[in-house]
Amino acid sequence: LRRQRQMCIRDSTATIWGISFVAQSEGGDAVGAFTFNATRNLIGSLVLVPVILLLGRLNPSGKAVSSSSASEGNIFSRNRTLILGGVSCGICLCLASNFQQVGISYSSVGKAGFITACYIVIVPILGLFMKKKCSPFIWMAIVLALIGLYLLCITDGFSIGKGDILVLICAFLFSLHILVIDYFSPHVDGVKMSCIQFLVCGILTAIPALIFEHPQLSAFKGAWGSILYAGVMSCGVAYTLQIIGQKNMNPTVASLILSLESCISALAGWILLGQK
């Protein structure tokens, strides 16, 4: 039952992310990439604050809902691990999401979704250096998934442009993000770590946004719907579900499930944006 719940959580995460490609494409037309990402991540962090407070009331003993069963004497150690995990995830997410957001502005939603999903190959390769081996069956599933994603998302032939290179770098960085989550998630409260990662990502991204883009409040009028979806659903909900759902799960299997986002992105791009 626990495994089925984790699978359901991962499927929901991938679906929300897939639709988020449309929000990113639309929002990126109204405001700069850094401004969009800084705002969405800060919103994601704020959304989780009342959730953390509510869970704290429901769990008055102080034991983290999603943390390991460490003794009360290890509270300082758990908090240090929580902060380190949140900051590490935030840095990875900051780099990955900004490369993706800039890359999407030069590429189609479906193509960006396919290239991003290349983390299904990168994760197991990087995992080998962390002594996380995959069975031949999983490698076969990776190859079949990659072929299927290509046939679904790439309809006009495949050529490499500037945006595609940026999104490919993003795929590598998201692979690191998945592996960092795999390392920290069994030991910390997933909701709290997610909140910290968004705060770190939002602050780091706000720096180049203020320096290079000089955001004006008037520019947000045409982007609030996209920013709110990306902030509340993609960040606040989906990334938090990723941390919770990935707990004690093989990171390669997790990446395969998450690759469903590329299928959803292609479908959403076709329905909502008319991209073929």
Task: Label each region the model flagged.
Residues 2-9:
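Short, small-residue-biased leader/transition segments that mark boundaries at the very start
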Residues 15-18, 22, 49, 90, ...:
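Hydrophobic/small/kink-forming positions within alpha-helical transmembrane segments
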Residues 20-21, 55-116, 151, 231-249:
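Specific transmembrane alpha-helical segments of multi-pass solute transporters/efflux pumps
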Residues 34, 44-48, 123-124, 129, ...:
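Transmembrane alpha-helical segments that form core, pore/gating elements
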Residues 39, 112-118, 181-202, 235-271:
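Helix-helix packing/entry segments at the starts of transmembrane helices
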Residues 41-42, 49, 54-58, 65-68, ...:
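C-terminal-most transmembrane helix of multi-pass membrane proteins
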Residues 48, 134-154, 174, 205, ...:
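Hydrophobic transmembrane alpha-helices of multi-pass small-molecule transport proteins
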Residues 80, 84, 113-116, 129-148, ...:
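Loop-to-transmembrane alpha-helix entry segments
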